[in-house]
Curated annotation (Swiss-Prot):
Residues 342-614 form the Protein kinase domain. Pfam families: Lectin_legB (PF00139), Pkinase (PF00069). This is Probable L-type lectin-domain containing receptor kinase I.6. The gene is LECRK16. One of its GO terms (cellular component) is plasma membrane. InterPro entries: ConA-like_dom_sf, Kinase-like_dom_sf, L-type_Lectin-RKs, Legume_lectin_dom, Prot_kinase_dom, Protein_kinase_ATP_BS, Ser/Thr_kinase_AS. The chain crosses the membrane at residues 286-306. Glycans are attached at N123, N180, N203, N224. The active site is at D466. Residues 24-257 are annotated as: Legume-lectin like. It comes from the Eukaryota. Keywords: ATP-binding, Cell membrane, Glycoprotein, Kinase, Lectin, Membrane, Nucleotide-binding, Receptor, Serine/threonine-protein kinase, Signal, Transferase, Transmembrane, Transmembrane helix.
Amino acid sequence: MAQGLHLIWVIFCLHLICISSQQETEFIFNGFGQADLYTDGVAKILPNGLLQLTDGSGQKMGHAFFKKPFEFKSPRSFSFSTHFVCALVPKPGFIGGHGIAFVLSASMDLTQADATQFLGLFNISTQGSPSSHLVAVELDTALSAEFDDIDANHVGIDVNSLMSIASTPAAYFSEIDGENKSIKLLSGDPIQVWVDYGGNVLNVTLAPLKIQKPSRPLLSRSINLSETFPDRKFFLGFSGATGTLISYQYILGWSLSRNKVSLQTLDVTKLPRVPRHRAKNKGPSVVLIVLLILLAIIVFLALGAAYVYRRRKYAEIREEWEKEYGPHRFSYKDLYIATNGFNKDGLLGKGGFGKVYKGTLPSKGQIAVKRVSHDAEEGMKQFVAEIVSMGNLKHKNMVPLLGYCRRKGELLLVSEYMPNGSLDQYLFNDEKPPFSWRRRLLIIKDIATALNYMHTGAPQVVLHRDIKASNVMLDTEFNGRLGDFGMARFHDHGKDPATTAAVGTIGYMAPELATVGACTATDVYGFGAFLLEVTCGRRPVEPGLSAERWYIVKWVCECWKMASLLGARDPRMRGEISAEEVEMVLKLGLLCTNGVPDLRPSMEDIVQYLNGSLELPDISPNSPGIGSFTPLIIGSNPPVSPSTKTFYTSSSANDSTFVTHSIIHGDGR
C-alpha cells in the first residue's frame, strides 16, 4: 500500500514539473513593458512597451529572444503556435528597408551575422550552412537577386539559408471575397502574423490588425524541425536589419503556446501605438534668415558677374530644322546640373561612342546621359531625326530614349536610368553574384522580343548594330532591356538599308558587314554572339586564351563536335540547369552566327524557338556555315591584346554622309 502511494506521489510530482515547464514557454505580451527578453544590437523596449528592432539608422541589426528555450520530449510533440503583431515603418526620405524575421535558433547569439539583405540571421560564411541550426519566417521588403527573391514584398520560409524553401507575395485570405488580398508589409500599419507548426507542417498566416485569423494560411510547407534541431531545443524571437534601405521595425505584441487550442489571443486595444516618423521641419531663426539674405545678395552679384561667361560655357547649337523636335530636346545646362557637372562619381560606364553618366531631372527622375563625340555637321539632321524616332518607339524590353542635346562637337543622348546596371557586370564581375540559368534565359527572351519588335513591329525597320551584354540593361525587376541606340539606323520595310557602315564591336559583327553593309541578318548575327556570351559566361573574343578558344563561335562548335556541348556553359551558373534548354540556346547561337547570311533565322523565328512554339531546325556542327567564324577586322591583324583600336567608318542615308569614329576595346566594350 505504501509503495503504491509513493508511486502515485512520484507521478504527480513529475506531472507538476511538466506543467511548470510548459507554462514557462507559454506566454502573452500585450506590449513588452513587463517582458524579460534578451536583446542585442540596436533592439530595445521603448517606454510605451513597444519592442523596437531597428532605430532608423543604416547598416544596423537588432535581435530579441524569449530567454527560456522551447524544448520537446519527442518528435511527436514537436509543435507550437505563435501570434504576433508587427509594423514596418518607412523612414522619411529613404526608400524601403530589409524586413524582419520570426526566428527559431539553436542559439540567441546572432551577433556575428550581417545586416542588410542578410536580415541579421547569417553572414557570407554561415549562409547556407547546415550547422547554423536556424529556421526563419521572413517578412522581406527588399528584392535580393542573389537569394532568388520573388519580389520586394513577400513572405518566405528559410532553413539555414536566405534562399527560401517556400515564398509568396504578402497577402491574406478574405473570408468575404473568398480570395487572397494583397497586403503591403512596408506600410507602417500593424500586421498580424500567425505561425503554426505541427505534424511536420509549418503554416504562416497574415491579416491586417482588425481582422480575425483567416481560415486559410498564406504559406504552408512540410518541414521536419527535429532534423534542424536534433537537440529538440531552440529559442524563439525576432531579427531585423537595415542597410542603405532603412525602415523602423517594431513588434507590438506576442503570444506563444504549444498548440493552437491553448494559444491566447492578443488584445489589440492594449497594444502600444506605433510612432509616425516625420521629417524634421524647424523654422529658420532670424539670424539665419539675415545670413541667407546676405548670402543671396552675394550669390546674385557673383552670378551677374559670371553671366556672360556662363552663357558662352553652356552655349548650344540650335538650327531652324530642330524646332519640330522641341519636346525631345534638353538644354545642356539642365543636363550639366543633373549630372553634377558630369562628375566622375556619377560615371556609369564608357564604350566606343562615349561615356555614360547618371543624373537626376526634376521632371524625369533618374536618367542616364551619354556624351557622344561628333565633329561632323553633315548628316546631323538625319542622325537627330533617327534619335527622336527611336524615342517614339515604346517597348517594355527597350530602354526608353527620352531625347537629346547638341553642343559644339558633341551630341548628348538622354535615356531612362536602369538601377541594376548592365548585364555584363553580372557575367564578368566576380563581385556580383552570377545569375542562375532561369534568369539568363528570361533576359535572353526579353532581348529577342525587343529585336523582333525593332525588325518587324516598328513603323520602320530598326537596325541596332551593336547587340552585346554591356548594352543590355537591367531594370528594378532584373528584366532585360536593350539600350544604347547610338549606332541604330532606320529603313522602310521591304527596302534595303542605305548604309555601308561597318560599325560595332569585334566578335559581334557579321563577316559580310564590310561588303554588303548592315541588315537584319547582321543584327541576328550579333544576337547569336550575345546568346553564346550569356550562356558561356565569356566574351565572343578572348585574346588571352589559347588560340583554339579565341573566338567563342568556333570554340562552341568544337565542343559540339567533341560531344561535350553542355560543357561550354558558364561553370559559375547557379541554381537548377535544364540541359535541354542550354543545348538548344547554344545551337541557336551557332545558327544565328551562321557564316552564310541567308541561313540565319529571322528574329520572329528566334522568338518562337525560345518560347518552344517552334522546333529548332535539324542542324549539326558540320552543317553548312555552322562554326565558320571569320572575324571582321578593319585592319590587318586580329586583336592580340585588350588594347584600344580605332576604326573610321562612314554611312550614307538620304544623300547625307555621317562620319563617325568608333573606339572598340579588345575586351568587348
